[in-house]
Each structure stands twice: as structure tokens, then as C-alpha cells.
Amino acid sequence: MAVKTYNAGVKDYRNTYWEPDYSVKDTDILAVFKITPQAGVDREEAPAAVAAESSTGTWTTVWTDLLTDLDYYKGRAYRIEDVPGDDTCFYAFIAYPIDLFEEGSVVNVFTSLVGNVFGFKAVRALRLEDVRFPIAYVKTCGGPPHGIQVERDIMNKYGRPLLGCTIKPKLGLSAKNYGRACYEGLRGGLDFTKDDENVNSQPFMRWRQRFDFVMEAIQKAEAETGERKGHYLNVTAPTPEEMYKRAEYAKEIGAPIIMHDYITGGFCANTGLANWCRDNGMLLHIHRAMHRVLDRNPHHGIHFRVLTKILRLSGGDHLHSGTVVGKLEGDREATLGWIDIMRDRFIKEDRSRGIFFDQDWGSMPGVMPVASGGIHVWHMPALVTIFGDDSVLQFGGGTLGHPWGNAKGAAANRVALEACVEARNRGVAIEKEGKAVLTEAAKHSPELKIAMETWKEIKSEFDTVDKLDVAHK
């Protein structure tokens, strides 16, 4: 048996963590980082340093390396690629053995992959672009509490996108007036109304009163329309204990769905809440507040496609996904990529949409993408084309800003939605022919006609900051 020797001192990371000949294993967790190295840092040294700091390494050789099988547990930088059109940075591909991570813990995964390594002096900027989770790891995670098909069965709604509305103004309404706004929207044709991300339990509207008035609105709207209705009751709270208290009360009063801010609320809390929803028959809507702090800078942070994968593992039945056409930025091809990541069982590598790895979700349910942010009836043809049926199209100002009130705004959106779905089903290219489709529908809907006149000049044409690096195929 060979005797292990220990040589103290500082070594180049590439001597241990750069392995260009490594054969990736099916069980490895794979990550691709965009690295902007400091001046003078070698092209192979920088990714090796990232692999070391995000797995087993430290700044110097330590004698306790001899007490474990370092070669088994270490992360390995195995490939480098140029970033098209940007010679200041490059892509580095790193493989991590699955045993580095606690089963079913996205918290532990992120602690390694986006932990201390992001403050590493060897790199000037670092961005996690994509992660491949092996099926062996996927199966240790609970995932969405119910998924798309179960939600459709619970709500008894099929064959079209679901229609929602975020109540505005997002802050300042009393609980009674808030409930009235929900009722008007639901009776007008919405499937869901929604708390905004920062509606928790403030002095102007405590959570219990809001829950009570909203549930009264749901029940009244259901009785009038004969349709199942819901409202995303935000249970995000200062502590997990308070969060579960609010969730339990929502269940007690008969609410079908609750809501959580998964980034500001925390991944640990989110996974626990998803497990609770699965056990208690509650749907879980997820808001992504704070995501742009992490994902907007094209050189530093975490790409949103990674945040979607983490959410699918942690658990949520809905996730805000951008709109492409509204007030919030989002590249079309990239958005289509992460919509597939949220919904599909298997997603192939597709650099034209920013997808670096095949991703197999096995039997894990999908997440319903939610389009929300500055959208109105004129956007409906594009939204139905981009998102398809398994989505929620959520109009806040585009409902509540209707000149005739909330119910009429909801009716306008419902007519526009059903007209677009019907035209699409007849084979009409609705994104191209959308104006004609809406104009024809408006002949029989004064609510839609007024909505079209109100928002015909409203556009959001600012360029996207975070663009795809690769040329479209």
C-alpha cells in the first residue's frame, strides 16, 4: 500500500482541480459559470479556483486532505469555452460528485455553488449560468406540491390559460376594500386574484382580516358565476412559525391556494411550505421578488434559468416567469427556454435559448409559468402564443385600470383570451393576426372595445439588459 505524503504550502489550483480529460458521470451535478478573471489570472487557474472553493479546496494545502479521498469528492473544472462577442470572460464547466450535497436540499446546493466562491479575489466577476441536476438528485427533492394537471383538476379549468389579476394599489387598501376589489375581478371573469409580493400583515391591513374578506369575495363570486375561483393569499411572514400559522388559517377557511416569496422568504422556508401544501391539498403560488438583484447583471450573479430549476426542486405550483412583451425585461428565446425548464419533463441542450445541459426531471410535476407585469388586452395574442395553455396570464393594471371598473376590466380580458384561444384552435396565426382577432371580438364586447381604446398607445420598448450570449441558430 502506497504511503500518502503531505507537502505543505500553496499550490496552483489547476494542479488539482483542472481536469480537461475528465469524463462526466451521469450522477454528477454540472455547473457552467461565466468567469471574468482578474488581470494576470491564468485561463485554467480561474475555473480551477472556482471548482476548489465551491467544493473541497481552501487557499493552502492542509494535512487533513490525507484523511479523505480528495480525488473522489473534489469538484473538477473540465471545459472552457469562449463567450461569443465578449473576450473579457469565458464559460467554465465544473462537475461536482453528487455526494457533496445533502439529498433534497437546494439550500445546501446553493451554499456550495453560489457561496463564498462569489467573493473570491481570483475572479473579478462570476455568474452561474446553468446547472444540470442528475435524475439521482432530482428524485430526492419533493418538487411542486401538485403540478399543472392536478391544479386544473382542482380548479376544473381546461383548454386555455388561466386568467389572473394582482390587486392594486398593492399597498394601502383596507381589508374590506381589498376584498371588494377581488370580488369585482372574480365575478367579471378572472380565475384568480392575487396579493402582491409585499402584501404581508401591515397596519393598514392585517393578514387575518384580509384572508376573511378575500374568502368572502371568492365564495360570493363562485356562487354567482358557477366557476371555481381563487386568490393567492401571501403567507410570507417574519418567521417560519408565523408563516405556517397563516397557511393553516387559509386552509381552515377553505382557500384553494396560498403564496410565498421564495427568494426573500428563503429556500428552507419554501421547501417546508411546499411539503406542507402537498400534505394539506393546497396549491402554492411563488413570487420571485428580489430575483433581479441576482440575475440582471450579465457578468455577475445567478441566471434566472438556475433560479427556475431551484424552485422546481424546492417546490411551487406557479412561478412568475416574465412576459417578454410587458414592462419587465425578458429576452424571448431565453424566456421560452426557462418556461420549458419549468413545465417539461425533459429539456435538451439548446444554446440558442441559453440552455447548456440536457435536464431530465423524471416524473417530477411541472410548474405553471405566470406572465405578469405591465400587460393589457393588446398583448393577449402574443401571450397566448408564447405561453400556451399551461400558464397564468396575470393583468393587474390591465384589469383594474379599465375605465368602467374592475369587473369590466376582467370581462375584457376574458373575452380577449377566449377569442385568441378560439382563433388559435382554428389555425389562425394569432400573434400576426391578433389585431383582427381582437377587433372582431370587440364588436360583441363593449368592455373589450373600451380596453383596446384605452391602452392602444401603451408600449414597453426598452431594450433588454440581460441578452443571450449566443447567436440564435
Swiss-Prot record:
| Pfam family name, one | RuBisCO_large_N
State if Metal-binding is listed as a keyword. yes
Might you give the EC number(s) for this enzyme?
A: 4.1.1.39
Against InterPro entries, the record matches this protein to: RuBisCO, RuBisCo_large_chain_AS, RuBisCO_lsu_C, RuBisCO_lsu_C_sf, RuBisCO_lsu_fd_N, RuBisCO_lsu_N_sf, RuBisCO_lsuI
Q: Which residues form a coiled coil?
A: none
| Record GO terms (molecular function) | magnesium ion binding; monooxygenase activity; ribulose-bisphosphate carboxylase activity
Recite the UniProt cofactor note for this protein: Binds 1 Mg(2+) ion per subunit.
Q: Which GO terms describe its biological process?
A: reductive pentose-phosphate cycle
What is the catalytic activity of this protein? Answer: 2 (2R)-3-phosphoglycerate + 2 H(+) = D-ribulose 1,5-bisphosphate + CO2 + H2O; D-ribulose 1,5-bisphosphate + O2 = 2-phosphoglycolate + (2R)-3-phosphoglycerate + 2 H(+)
User: Which of this chain's residues are annotated to bind substrate?
Assistant: N116, T166, K170, R288, H320, S372
* Site location (Transition state stabilizer): K327
Q: Which domain of life is it from?
A: Bacteria
Which residues constitute the catalytic centre? K168 (proton acceptor), H287 (proton acceptor)
UniProt KW keywords:
Calvin cycle, Carbon dioxide fixation, Lyase, Magnesium, Metal-binding, Monooxygenase, Oxidoreductase
Q: At what positions is N6-carboxylysine found?
A: K194
Cofactor(s) required, per the database record: Mg(2+)
Q: What does this protein do?
A: RuBisCO catalyzes two reactions: the carboxylation of D-ribulose 1,5-bisphosphate, the primary event in carbon dioxide fixation, as well as the oxidative fragmentation of the pentose substrate. Both reactions occur simultaneously and in competition at the same active site.
The record describes its quaternary structure and partners as: Heterohexadecamer of 8 large chains and 8 small chains.
Name of the protein this chain belongs to: Ribulose bisphosphate carboxylase large chain 2
Task: Supply the source organism's classification.
Answer: Bacteria, Pseudomonadati, Pseudomonadota, Acidithiobacillia, Acidithiobacillales
